[in-house]
Amino acid sequence: MNTTSLSYRDAGVDIDAGDALVENIKPFAKRTMRPEVLGGIGGFGALVEISKKYKEPVLVSGTDGVGTKLKLAFDWNRHDTVGIDLVAMSVNDILVQGAEPLFFLDYFACGKLDVAQATEVIKGIAAGCEQAGCALTGGETAEMPGMYPAGEYDLAGFAVGVVEKSKVISGRDIVPGDVVLGLASNGVHSNGYSLVRKIIDRAQPELDAPFDGDKTLRDAVIAPTRIYVKPLLKLMETLPVKGMAHITGGGITENTPRVLPDNTVAQIDAASWQLPKLFQWLQREGNVDIQEMYRTFNCGIGMVVVVAPEHAEQALALLREAGETVYRIGQVRERQGGEHQTQIA
């Protein structure tokens, strides 16, 4: 019988490494704090009060991950921006219902904790929270020996926001004649990477050659998801927004109908914006049909916004003033029979 004394570290879990990570990330989390947050990082739960400016506050929650984009982060040792992706996926989702993101939590799981690597990831999460104006109030770092290969991890994020009950955006007021605007994406964002990786494997491109201006192909592929919170909150404060759709898995084709009444169609003009160079490359190298592109990728449009025609020009001007590239990409019309609710031509 072996009587050697064993420790948790012998089993593969390093509590000291976890403590070191917490100390590393505290200053980054502190920069994200909002006045509604009571207390700091390290408690069993985060306390957040609802501002008294809300008469009938409605909490809006969302959760998401980064998907197989993480495989590229592992392969390329690029961990500094996947945290931004993680935040973007959840805060953009709750934003479309009119919610201002209040706080964010993350879950980081790995087989063996690499403190430097995890610090890079969580610094990115904090940067995303700063972009979104929400507080990083806590998270879970799960070191699980034998569950993940060396150097790999998984991420999940959770966002909670608040909206006045009378200002919830549901899309129910959208009618034929309304205008569809498209806010430019920053690249592939966080969806469609299984196909992206397959195309890269087939094409075997020179990833570090100049590709788009001063960007390499590698830079373009792994560019972080754009966070639309601040410009769209400003827009919602200024004029009525009827509906918004975050263009994620399923592309423009499958996400736009999520905000449309059943009797309407978004008629999208494909000529209203230019397919960005990265998507042109993916389509060419993968020989991907254009309609498959639209139902897989954002194709350059990361967020769809629907407004009344009388507000369209003002909305365009406000968003451009806020630094967004935005296009008038289509119009809502009446649905004919059982046709798909996104028509792109």
Swiss-Prot record:
GO CC terms on record?
A: cytosol
Pathway named in the protein's UniProt entry: Purine metabolism; IMP biosynthesis via de novo pathway; 5-amino-1-(5-phospho-D-ribosyl)imidazole from N(2)-formyl-N(1)-(5-phospho-D-ribosyl)glycinamide: step 2/2
Keywords (A to Z) from UniProt: ATP-binding, Cytoplasm, Ligase, Nucleotide-binding, Purine biosynthesis
Its domain of life?
A: Bacteria
Which GO biological process categories is it annotated with? 'de novo' IMP biosynthetic process; adenine biosynthetic process
Where does it reside? Cytoplasm
* Class of enzymatic activity (EC top level): ligase
The EC designation for this entry is 6.3.3.1
Catalysis: reaction(s): 2-formamido-N(1)-(5-O-phospho-beta-D-ribosyl)acetamidine + ATP = 5-amino-1-(5-phospho-beta-D-ribosyl)imidazole + ADP + phosphate + H(+)
Q: Name one GO molecular function term.
A: phosphoribosylamine-glycine ligase activity
The protein's predominant localisation is cytoplasm
Pfam entry (one): AIRS_C
Family indicated by similarity? Belongs to the AIR synthase family.
Record-given protein name: Phosphoribosylformylglycinamidine cyclo-ligase
- Native source organism of the sequence: Chromobacterium violaceum (strain ATCC 12472 / DSM 30191 / JCM 1249 / CCUG 213 / NBRC 12614 / NCIMB 9131 / NCTC 9757 / MK)
